[in-house]
A protein has these predicted regions:
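C-terminal and inter-domain tail/linker signature
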Residues: 1-251
Length: 251
């Protein structure tokens, strides 16, 4: 039986964790693979180098969530990789092989004020939900609230009892409104790069700034009845191209 694209991504992570280059690259297009992870060189050669030159204890990965939207697979992973502990990855497939990869990461943090970690909560997409409708809701929310800055519309999109997984925060709409007023003093979100979803899960990767420096904003939402009921995510500074191991751009 042929492997699904998600199973192929699991094989990549298994190979990385085991230090097995052959396994990690089994479902990667060896001629066309484009790497956007700023800490790995381009192509299969760069991925091979990343695996072979990294200490084993820094490449231990465990899948938390995975879903597929067309040719894209989105994953949330925990473990150790390059000194980070929580990861979102995007893999793009063509003809059954991985041809492109983006990676985002942050350090682990203690449970937040409501007791949630960066990875707990539902792990399987609820496929009975309307994916296209949920993606549309999130795109409109992001464009209205985070890009245009119209915070008056937040209650239209966010449930009063929203569950939040960011470090240092508390659940609920009221807490989110307070936090956002502070956060937006130091950041801009200028452009959505990805809106990918399956069922009630919708993932967004956007580009903006934090304190004037280029920044990626990575968010996973769970949507129910056209409202955001749960959120995971983090910002990550985008390093200058001259400091990265490939020149394809992080996002």
């Amino acid at each position: 039986m042929a492997k699904s694209d998600i199973e192929k991504v699991l094989t990549v992570f298994a190979g990385i964790s085991a230090g097995d280059v052959s396994l990690a690259t089994r479902h990667v297009d060896h001629k066309r693979f484009v790497q956007h992870n700023p800490y790995a060189a381009d192509g299969v050669e760069g991925l091979t180098q990343f695996i072979t030159q990294s200490p084993r204890d820094q490449l231990q990965l465990t899948m938390v969530r995975a879903f597929q939207d067309g040719c894209y697979v989105v994953t949330q992973v925990t473990g150790q990789r390059s000194g980070r502990n929580v990861f979102f990855d995007i893999f793009r497939f063509e003809h059954g092989l991985i041809v492109e990869h983006w990676a985002f990461s942050t350090e682990a943090a203690p449970p937040n004020e409501s007791g949630h970690t960066q990875i707990d909560g539902p792990t399987e997409a609820k496929l009975s939900e309307d994916t296209d409708k949920n993606k549309s809701v999130i795109r409109k929310y992001y464009e209205t609230v985070h890009i245009a800055g119209d915070h008056s519309k937040i209650p239209h999109y966010v449930a009063a009892d929203q569950v939040r997984h960011e470090p240092g925060v508390r659940d609920g709409l009221a807490a989110f409104l307070r936090d956002l007023e502070v956060i937006t003093q130091h950041r801009t979100i200028d452009e959505i790069k990805f809106v990918l979803g399956q069922g009630d899960f919708v993932f967004v990767a956007a580009r903006g700034t934090h304190e004037g420096n280029p920044c990626a904003y990575i968010d996973l939402y769970r949507v129910e009845s056209e409202k955001i009921i749960e959120h995971w995510g983090f910002p990550e500074e985008i390093p200058p191209l001259e400091e990265t191991k490939n020149k394809n751009g992080m996002l």
